[in-house]
């Protein structure tokens, strides 16, 4: 076993990677495939089934901003009534993400002090395996 691999495993044991998303989402399937192919251990939290608490959304907003978290291109966004999306700002975005967890971008990966939003194999390689 290489020293690099050993160090990576020590980091993974000490700092569990948490992956937030929706199990049946195509982007999540790509994420699971990538993580499994690179032997990355993680805990999956399905925020459609388990919900997401306001405190967690607040932490994410503080790290990356609501604009990066809110999925305004997905099907759920189109289903949200237009009057609920008027004058979109942080407070409204937060309320929408709590009411409609499927409107949160996927995946959200938390490891140590890192918060990764969306699937990007290159970012995963540098942030999760380095």
Predicted features, each with a name:
Residues 3-15:
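Short, Lys/Arg-enriched N-terminal segments with co-localized hydrophobic residues
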Residues 40:
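Short phosphate-binding/catalytic loops that engage adenosine nucleotides
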Residues 47-127:
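Thiol/selenol-based redox catalytic cores and closely related redox-interacting motifs
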